[in-house]
Every structure is written in structure tokens, then in C-alpha cells.
């Protein structure tokens, strides 16, 4: 089951051409968050919107900060070019790599895959949004777990 989901997600990353609902996202985001969101690859923006909408449908009481974190949780992938073939390869392999210095080439792609929550959190000013983005792969809080679950359902 896990492998099937993983392969489906990798093919979507490679082939996806879905236009993100930027109007939905920009209506929720604040200040510099909008610029950060717009710097993201359209695939990552569309994914963030789907995660935010899934959370909102499941938890209508979701705090705005949670929805903003959902929209920005993969913003760290925008730190360097992250090509479709790199997304597929690093989705299959995940060697331990340090977050810094950020490298070019394939090593940099592995860094982005592993450390994108950190890279995104470092660019977000709101402490609540920052904390949720940082924990979206290793949730510590209730809303962090809910964000993680909504992200994993992709």
C-alpha cells in the first residue's frame, strides 16, 4: 500500500499540470507569506491548496494559522530549482544529508527533500505558522498531526 501511494505521488510530481487555486491561497496568506507562496513551483502550490482545503473540509474550526501553514508547508522546496526528475529520484532514495551548506546538483536535491520544512520555516515570520511548517513531517502538536495526515493523504 505504501509503495503504491508513493509511486502515484511521484508520477503526479512528474506529470502534474494542475493550476493552483492562487486566489484561495492569497486570500488567506499575509504580507511576505504571499511572496513566499508565489515563489513556489505550481505543483507545490496546488498541493498546498489541496491540503488546506482538505483540512478546512475536515475541521471547519481550523485556525487560520493552520491553513496558512498548509499552504506554505512545502515552500522550502523553492529555495533552489527542484526539477521533476530530481523529485522522482529523491522520492525513492533519502540518504542522510546536512541542511547546510546548500549544494547544487543532486546533493542539493536530497537536501531540499529532507530539509524543506526547515528551509520554509526560516522564511516565515509568524511563529505559529513557522512552528507548524517545521513540524509537518514530525508532528508534535494536534494541528501538526492533522497537517501531517492531510499532507500524507496526497
What does each model-identified segment do?
Residues 31-154:
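Divalent metal-dependent catalytic cores for phosphoryl transfer on phosphate-bearing substrates
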Amino acid at each position: 500500500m505504501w509503495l503504491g501511494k508513493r509511486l502515484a505521488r511521484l508520477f503526479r510530481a512528474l506529470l502534474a499540470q494542475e493550476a493552483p487555486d492562487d486566489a484561495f491561497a492569497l486570500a488567506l496568506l499575509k504580507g511576505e507569506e504571499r511572496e513566499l507562496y508565489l515563489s513556489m513551483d505550481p505543483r507545490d502550490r496546488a498541493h498546498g491548496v489541496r491540503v488546506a482545503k482538505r483540512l478546512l473540509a475536515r475541521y471547519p474550526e481550523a485556525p487560520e494559522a493552520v491553513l496558512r501553514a498548509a499552504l506554505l508547508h512545502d515552500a522550502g522546496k523553492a529555495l533552489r530549482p527542484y526539477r521533476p526528475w530530481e523529485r522522482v529520484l529523491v522520492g525513492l532514495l533519502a540518504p542522510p544529508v546536512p541542511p547546510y551548506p546548500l549544494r547544487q546538483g543532486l546533493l542539493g536535491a536530497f537536501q531540499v527533500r529532507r530539509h524543506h520544512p526547515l528551509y520554509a520555516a526560516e522564511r516565515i515570520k509568524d511563529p505559529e505558522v513557522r512552528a507548524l511548517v517545521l513540524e509537518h513531517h514530525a508532528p508534535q502538536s494536534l494541528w501538526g498531526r492533522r497537517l501531517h495526515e492531510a499532507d500524507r493523504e496526497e
